[in-house]
Amino acid sequence: MAKSGIQNLKGFQKKLKKRIVDNPEKHLHSLVQRSTTLVEGTAKQSILKGGTGITYQKYNPRRQHTASAEGEPPASDTGFLVNSISSNVKRTKNAVVGQIIASAPYASHLEFGTRDIRPRPFMQPALEKNRPQIKRIFKKGGYID
């Protein structure tokens, strides 16, 4: 018969403590990886959701496109921006750093705007939307109170 109650809890705590103490960098790496993947997914979803701005005719290929309005995430047209978003986790001497990168050449122009184009942020809102969940991930992992 399976053990239950306090015995299982103590066993779980022992395994968790061993995992964290034996390899804290690997444990922290996995928490940062989960967090960056979460933000990456939210940023991509916000772009793929579509725009609410003006709709116009595209001619190559012939189709309609609804652009994003000021202040909302950019609307996907070709999928290049979404496909350029990736995340990685790097270990340095003193830290584990998670990065979410949009490598499309125009990504920063959309995120922050230009003189002629108002910002259409997608990364910062994705981070802000997931901030409570990221805090829960690190709290559950034992790194913050």
Could you say what each language-model-derived stretch is?
Residues 1-145:
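Short, Lys/Arg-rich flexible segments
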